[in-house]
Amino acid sequence: FAASTDGRFNDILLPLEWGEVVTEAEDILRTDHQSQILYSLMIDRFNNGNKANDWKLNSPEVLDKVDYQGGDIAGITAKINDGFFTDLGITTIWISPITQNPYDAWGQNVNPDTKFSGYHGYWPIYNTKVDERFGTDEELRTMLATAHDGEMNVILDYVANHLHIDSPVLKEHPDWTTDLYLPDGRKNIGQWDGETRLTTWFDEHIPTLDTRREEVCDPMTDTALYWVRNFDFDGYRHDACKHIPLNYWRMLTH
């Protein structure tokens, strides 16, 4: 805890390096995982570095605010190069999901008349393909190398809990999902706690994968590892952790 001269108390986090308090951000090494200063960004809303990949849905069903705005991987690289993160003392950049999302609009179960694009990245169709609206494999490798040259980590937000309903994986394996309906006939959507915590769907168009089953868990851990084996990511932020069973985490870290 820290206290002011007038007796006000608050908790404060002090980064340490070899037992010594770090007072300058540049003294924090990117290998000191417990001392990182993170910057979380949503790629589409961060910076547009390559207008050639801009692709709005331009649908009358979608408000402009929930359509694609043009942010991309090249935009992150540009901000690394111009010192944006360094000036803030950032040592780790956490980026939103980069995998391919749908090309059309989808509504929410609670209000199907309100439709959204997948600008956020949390509706994966392909788990090992960079969404072309965000960039290319080469642009991703360039961004990661640029961050590492600047002594910064990059962690990837990865979605293992669900796939978009249009995913070829789900079309080939429709039985890989949990049940949409509960025994009492209610839809198992948004049932976040209790017995349904590991089976509930976020919405009808993003079915939850039943990763309690080995034949489902194995390919989902393989696709997570794809990004660190084929690209130089420094780690993950896993989406919807509380809704994914323990066996997935054991398999991933085995």
Predicted regions: what they are:
Residues 46-231, 249-254:
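Substrate-binding/active-site clefts of carbohydrate-active enzymes
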Residues 155, 235-241:
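Short catalytic-loop micro-motif centered on adjacent basic/acidic residues
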Residues 25-53:
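Compositionally biased low-complexity segments at domain edges in trafficked proteins
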Residues 1-31:
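Extended acidic/polar, glycine-enriched regions
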